[in-house]
Amino acid sequence: AGAGKSTVAKAVAKKLGYIYIDTGAMYRAVTLYAIKKGFDPLDENKLSSALKDIDIKLDSEDHVYLNGEDVSHAIRENQISKLTSPVSAFPEVRKFLVAKQREFATAHNVIMDGRDIGTNVLPHAQIKIFMVATPECRAMRRVKEFQEKGENPVYESILQEIKDRDYRDSHRALNPMVKAEDAIELDTSNMNLEQGIEATTNLIKDKLEELK
């Protein structure tokens, strides 16, 4: 969260004419499903059993649909953000969504955004970029995002949530968040959004030239 990968990936996909896939949104949608159905998303057995009733679709306009309903805004609420990281560690949830992600990538030219794409979801992807930024920089970006929505988040709380999520995601038993050996690392700590988009676009174009 806050490294800028979603915003950058979305913009780069538009520039290159690729389809943008936000895998994090899919995990958020699963979390939201449990809340809508009135059960605890952290009840792993119940959530795993419910997966067969969940249909998630993404469109080229960045909308996310949960069983036909547009939940693009609902999945961005802070309550969902806090619960999604533990939910994404559940093996059955990961298997369910990874299968959907691979299916989509097979049929389209995509830029896929997520925390284990290059190592687990698409290990043979032509281009892998591992985007990083300091926790402090990421927390400031998240605070600005919430303020733009009219919310008043506490910087220290956001910073701690980011650090906790990083720890959980890099230490989970199934497909932890690590940089793929063949990934290019891009540190956006000292970049604004436009610079991040430009750097990423150039990396992709250079790599595509190499692959010709």
Which residues does each PLM region occupy?
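ATP-binding Walker
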Residues: 2-3
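Walker A/P-loop
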Residues: 6
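N-terminal phosphate/diphosphate-binding loop that engages ATP/GTP or pyrophosphate donors
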Residues: 14-77
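Residue-level signal for inorganic ion chemistry
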Residues: 24, 68, 97, 111, ...
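Small-molecule kinase domains that catalyze NTP-dependent phosphoryl transfer to phosphate-bearing small molecules
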Residues: 50, 101-108, 115, 119-120, ...
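ATP-dependent NMP and nucleoside kinases share a basic, alpha-helical "lid"
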Residues: 72-84, 88-149
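Glycine-rich phosphate-binding loops of nucleotide-dependent enzymes
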Residues: 128-136, 142-145, 178, 185, ...
